[in-house]
Amino acid sequence: MRRWVGIPALATLLLLTIGTLAWSQPRPLAWGVIIGRSPTLTAQFWNPILRYVSERSGVPLQLKVAPTGPEHTAMVRRGELHFLYSNHNFIKENEKSGYRVFGRPKGDTQSGEIVVLKDSPIRELSELEGKEVVFPHTAAFLGYHLPMDALMRRNIHVRPIFAGNQEGAITQLKTGRTVAAGLNAEVLKAYAEREHLAYRVLWGSEKYLNLALSAHPSVPADTVAAVRTALLEMADDPEGAKVLAVAAEAVKAPPLVFIPAKDSDFDNMRRFYRTTPVKIELQ
């Protein structure tokens, strides 16, 4: 049986805004981001970027973050988000939402891992049989779908628990509430460097392009083009580069550089979702 730990249930979506918009301005468009870090860090990272893009593109954007991965998945499926920085539009059940990829972070090949603390006596995946393993949430590609796929294909049965986001899962592992965790390798690495966490990798996936910049088909083409241009040129603009550096410092990660991308760049992720034995839980 699955159970959730680490964050309280939230009755409403968490809205993290990029600042008060004047009443005369157009209604801001929702910028959806899959939550991987704490809500505070998510806001500290994205708010400066969206403020810059809004000013440069003339398109007001508002950060909209669901408290859990499955709720984000449901928002994507219902087409509630105008723009996405996510991979939940590649889930087979969400393909009909019609989001169109227009960019991605440069060098954004990432992997999933199953890890234990460095001093753990567990050395092999098979030793996890029957044990509790924490994951971010049931909609996490790198942190749940890939690790659970690896366990299921090896006929290793674990008792999954869910922390709500990547850092919540790391905290469960760090405090000894579970013996192992399935995680985004890059988020874990950044957290470990920031918090001095020593861990050991039991299994790692192949690299995947992880997150895409996408637009809902209801967004006018000229609006998408304006936002796309602002993002893709951001790193080459001194002011934009400074904003990216400040955002990166908040999460102790290298600054993002956005580059063009297309839907076919993520075909391997779509293939995974069409063949995995992992049940994709949707709301």
Regions found by a protein language model. Give the residues of each.
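Hydrophobic/proline-rich hinge and linker segments of small-molecule sensing/allosteric domains
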Residues: 101-124, 212-216
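Positively charged n-region of N-terminal signal peptides that target proteins for export
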Residues: 1-4
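Extracytoplasmic small-molecule ligand-binding "clamshell" domains
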Residues: 25-90
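An extracytoplasmic/periplasmic, membrane-proximal ligand-sensing/linker region
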Residues: 27-33, 37-48, 215-283
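Short helices/loops that flank or line small-molecule/ion binding pockets
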Residues: 70-83, 96-97, 126, 167-182, ...
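Short loop->beta-strand "edge-of-pocket" segments that line small-molecule binding or catalytic clefts
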Residues: 29-37, 42, 126-143
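Pocket-lining segment of extracytoplasmic ligand-binding domains
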Residues: 120-121, 131-229
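Bacterial N-terminal signal peptides
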Residues: 8-19
